[in-house]
Design a protein with these regions (language model features):
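Conserved SAM-binding loop
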Residues: 33-152, 186-190, 225-230
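S-adenosyl-L-methionine-dependent methyltransferase catalytic module, highlighting the catalytic core
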Residues: 2-30, 72, 79, 120-128, ...
Length: 235
């Protein structure tokens, strides 16, 4: 079974979901979606790398004129098109490792929630995201934090600290650990982005206990979230 077929099978439940609704922010962000939506991102165009059914991109419909979603799974992209049919949504089926449909220096902001851990070549994906961003453009990216305190404790007792599926990643018969190929800390994800030329501006912690997760994000945040910028000034 090919990888794209596995993803389509894994996410087949996305079809027929209720219409998207607005995320209600109440205090410090408690999950990956709130952590991105909480930031004051505005502009002409926004790209969601790994847009899924469009739930995150939907939150930016009043802040950007163009809503562009890149999604590897054709099943998930079709779900996004249904959800976003009355919005200026542009769906692209493909991988972040190669986005020939997008011109260089054409995007104001990129968001990506729990996607980079699925991408085989993370260096190429980072290079492509830098390429399509306009000078001064912003990338907001998050991924599970393998150094979260609960993960450290699981490893301490000899259990694999899986970040998607239970039972040490064996919870699905389709893909090991939900298709996660890589595991990141704040430092390692920062190094990947900096290698491509991004400048890291903020490291943001989030979780169910609110701001507490931000006091020591490398240990207490359930996810790694970075705000990075492409050097240069917008034309």
């Amino acid at each position: 079974m090919s990888l794209d077929t596995k993803y389509d099978k894994f996410y087949s439940s996305d079809t027929g979901q209720p219409a998207h609704t607005d995320v209600v922010l109440n205090g410090w962000p408690r999950n990956r979606t709130e952590a991105i939506v909480n930031l004051p991102l505005t502009g002409d165009s926004i790209l969601d790398v790994g847009c899924g059914d469009g739930r995150l991109l939907y939150q930016f419909r009043h802040r950007f004129k163009r809503l562009i979603g890149l999604e590897y799974s054709a099943v998930r992209l079709e779900a996004a098109k249904v959800q976003m049919q009355h919005l200026p949504f542009e769906g692209i089926c493909g991988s972040a490792e190669a986005m020939p449909q997008l011109a260089s220096n054409s995007i104001d902001a990129i968001v990506s929630a729990d996607v980079i851990e699925h991408i085989p070549d993370v260096y190429q994906a980072a290079d492509e995201m830098l390429r399509v961003l306009r000078p001064g453009g912003v990338l907001v990216i998050n991924t599970p934090n393998i150094a979260f305190v609960k993960k450290r404790l699981r490893l301490l007792v000899g259990r694999f600290p899986s970040t998607s599926q239970p039972n040490e990643g064996l919870g699905s018969d389709v893909m090991f650990d939900g298709g996660h190929l890589h595991y990141f800390t704040y430092r390692s994800l920062s190094l990947v982005l900096e290698r491509s030329g991004f400048v890291i501006e903020r490291r943001i912690g989030f979780g169910q206990l609110g701001r507490l997760h931000h006091t020591w994000p490398s240990l207490l945040s359930v996810g790694v979230q970075l705000l990075a910028r492409k050097p240069g000034l917008a034309p």
